[in-house]
């Protein structure tokens, strides 16, 4: 069996003609919100469209959804998934008097107040903060960050129920409507603001496939979101964004109830010391891998490509190392939303992923995942893991999975086969959200069901084989592994077969 070190000594240094297994998420903004550009992004490697609900009107987001669907008409290809990223509960400062900025020096003492009379009258003496309980949760000596850490303050005194006395730790400007972070302080904000609830209802109505849920702190936050999505949104996948210390502390419980995870390093790097984000990223990805929950790595991955046609070497290493850590997906934000080189950014990410994936020693990784997964596993997971074992023993070229719900291909992906996973499904939603799982290539089988179950299975397998051959994954005579159910419906994928194309 090839070790990781042995693998690295024979690593190809070019992308070659391999199939990329890591999915790419791109935020859609003014530079990319039209069908033709979306087609170009998809051809470059985009799998999931992200809408950032911190910005834009419903009319704008509606246009993104419509343009994404038009791009599929122009370029059928594989299904495109659409994600709604919530704004999330947040703390912000008020409006400055006259809407002007007020400079402050280091060691400047001032007041933070929750009194509404200062909401539109902030200056260098008093700053309004819209979190009523801030005086209850914070204590003397704690740090407060404003404007993503551009300004730092130390709490000198909790004066009363509405007032904090603080001291600036650096020079800066007091500006309107800036975000506030309370690192090391547990806050009791609700899981969803009223805006978030309305946004989720918009997502349900318009058929989004997944929700990226911001600032998740507890497992109950996830259950609250599921409740708001309701019966009509029961098939929407929830991807929790871990971006504060509470989320990190409660991650094990959160992981049990979420569908997938995003390591959102932007706010996380404000809430905890930046060097610690490295360890947190690796830990959360590893735990997600073991749980078989897809995991996304996000924020500033190719930030310089917002304005430059080429990335920094550090950015390329960041993308590659996230994939080596075990990320199923990597994400672009401003690079595709407002950047000057959105297609270049996706192409760069795709090329980097291809090379990074070649550095993975897949069989030792499979052994680790199998050995560390608690037993007994479900029947579906046992079959999924056995399919991957069969791939290594038979040197199979592909795993073809016939699935209704999309659960089986996700569990096959967990065990990281060194070949593509071809998903054949009649469920378009399952095809779309399967992009969250590394190595899954979804195809929607549109032919009507055949009354004879065995014949129907054979027809779908034939379809999967044809797609694998079209992709160049295998040729006639090659060995493949297949998983299918013994009868119709969800939850019956327990039949494994090794065959030749």
Curated annotation (Swiss-Prot):
K(+) binds at residues 52, 54, 85-86. Mg(2+) binds at residues 243, 267. Keywords: ATP-binding, Glycolysis, Kinase, Magnesium, Metal-binding, Nucleotide-binding, Potassium, Pyruvate, Transferase. Disulfide bonds: none annotated. GO terms for cellular component: cytoplasm. Its cofactor is Mg(2+); K(+). One of its GO terms (molecular function) is potassium ion binding. SUPFAM superfamilies: Phosphoenolpyruvate/pyruvate domain (SSF51621), PK beta-barrel domain-like (SSF50800), PK C-terminal domain-like (SSF52935). InterPro entries: Pyr_Knase, Pyrv/PenolPyrv_kinase-like_dom, Pyrv_kinase-like_dom_sf, Pyrv_Knase-like_insert_dom_sf, Pyrv_Knase_AS, Pyrv_Knase_brl, Pyrv_Knase_C, Pyrv_Knase_C_sf. It is an enzyme of class 2 (transferase). The record marks 241 as: Transition state stabilizer. It comes from the Eukaryota. Pathway: Carbohydrate degradation; glycolysis; pyruvate from D-glyceraldehyde 3-phosphate: step 5/5. Its EC number is 2.7.1.40. It catalyses: pyruvate + ATP = phosphoenolpyruvate + ADP + H(+). Substrate binds at residues 50, 266-267, 299. ATP binds at residues 52-55, 92, 178. Homotetramer. Belongs to the pyruvate kinase family. This is Pyruvate kinase. It comes from Naumovozyma castellii. The gene is PYK1.
């Amino acid at each position: 069996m090839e070790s990781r070190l042995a693998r690295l000594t024979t690593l190809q240094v070019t992308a070659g003609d391999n199939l990329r297994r890591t999915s790419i998420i791109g935020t859609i903004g003014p530079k990319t919100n039209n069908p033709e550009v979306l087609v170009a992004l998809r051809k470059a490697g985009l799998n999931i469209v992200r809408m950032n609900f911190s910005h834009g009107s419903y009319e704008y987001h509606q246009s993104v959804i419509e343009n994404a669907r038009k791009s599929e008409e122009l370029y059928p290809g594989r299904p495109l998934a659409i994600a709604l990223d919530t704004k999330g509960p947040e703390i912000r400062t008020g409006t400055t008097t006259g809407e002007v900025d007020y400079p402050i020096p280091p060691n400047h003492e001032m007041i933070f107040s929750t009194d509404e009379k200062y909401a539109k009258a902030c200056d260098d003496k008093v700053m309004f903060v819209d979190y009523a309980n801030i005086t209850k949760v914070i204590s003397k000596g704690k740090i407060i960050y404003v404007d993503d850490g551009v300004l730092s303050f130390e709490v000198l005194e909790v004066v009363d129920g509405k007032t904090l006395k603080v001291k600036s730790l650096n020079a800066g400007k007091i500006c309107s409507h800036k975000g506030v972070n309370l690192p090391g302080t547990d806050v009791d904000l609700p899981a969803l603001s009223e805006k978030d609830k309305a946004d989720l209802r918009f997502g349900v109505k318009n058929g989004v496939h997944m929700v990226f849920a911001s600032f998740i702190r507890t497992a109950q936050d996830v259950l609250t979101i599921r409740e708001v999505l309701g019966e009509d949104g029961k098939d929407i996948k929830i991807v929790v964004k871990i971006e504060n210390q509470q989320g990190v502390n409660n991650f094990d419980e959160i992981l049990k109830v979420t569908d997938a995870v995003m390591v959102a390093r932007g706010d996380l790097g404000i809430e905890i010391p930046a060097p610690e984000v490295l360890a947190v990223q690796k830990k959360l990805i590893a735990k997600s891998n073991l749980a078989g929950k897809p995991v996304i790595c996000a924020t500033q991955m190719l930030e310089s490509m917002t304005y430059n046609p080429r990335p920094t070497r550090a950015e390329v290493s960041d993308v590659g190392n996230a994939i080596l850590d075990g990320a199923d997906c990597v994400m672009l934000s401003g690079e595709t939303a407002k950047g000057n080189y959105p297609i270049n950014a996706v192409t760069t990410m795709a090329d980097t992923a291809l090379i990074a994936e070649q550095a993975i020693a897949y069989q030792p990784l499979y052994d680790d995942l199998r050995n560390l997964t608690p037993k007994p596993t479900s029947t579906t997971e046992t079959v999924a893991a056995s399919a991957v074992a069969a791939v290594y023993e038979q040197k199979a070229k592909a795993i073809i999975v016939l699935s209704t719900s999309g659960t089986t291909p996700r569990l096959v992906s967990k065990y990281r086969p060194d070949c593509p996973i071809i998903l054949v499904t009649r469920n378009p939603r399952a095809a779309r959200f399967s992009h969250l799982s590394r190595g899954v290539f979804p195809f929607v089988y549109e032919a009507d069901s055949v009354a004879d179950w065995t014949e129907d299975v054979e027809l779908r397998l034939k379809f999967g084989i044809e797609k694998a051959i079209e992709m160049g994954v295998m040729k006639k005579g090659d060995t493949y592994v297949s998983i299918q159910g013994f009868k119709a419906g969800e939850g019956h994928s327990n039949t494994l077969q090794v065959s030749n194309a």
